[in-house]
């Protein structure tokens, strides 16, 4: 037996909950929305090509396994109304994946104050000879908060054999950071590795 909470979604990707049941969720090719406890859905932030959002970020796009993915809630949300959203961006060449920090309005009708606290996670620009090997493949990426209030961010290997063991390229990793995107205290990566690195050598972490 099951209860349908929402339907007619397009590629729903992630959810994050407040204690009162408020649910932030992403649709990979549409954007960020929130389901309120009373059942009302507020669209918050769209991306290139999406419609029905009060604001959109034109650099955010969807291709293959890439798009708007992980979402997490700041441990001090009651005070700062911050959330974190991981999305693919064409703001730079080559394109990258970015972890954005956003501020939710008091009435949960909009977001503002975008700050990209991570902007250097690789994105697969071209197709390769792999199963499902098109652009955007093996792109990660989940965001979660640990008990100490730090952020975990998971990234994919882009079908690129150089990424898993690279000390400086942030694909194929789990990153652990504070809420400003800096390396979290207690990280112990091997010498020469980016200090945000928590674990490395992964295929396409999404859990």
Per-region residue spans from a language model:
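Repeat-solenoid scaffold signature
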Residues: 194-207
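Acidic, Gly/Ser/Thr-rich repeat motifs that build Ca2+-stabilized beta-propeller blades
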Residues: 1-162, 207
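Beta-propeller blade signature
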Residues: 97-107, 167-180
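Short, well-ordered junction/capping motifs at the entry into regular secondary structure
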Residues: 159, 189-195
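Blade/loop signatures of beta-propeller domains
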Residues: 1, 108-111, 180-191
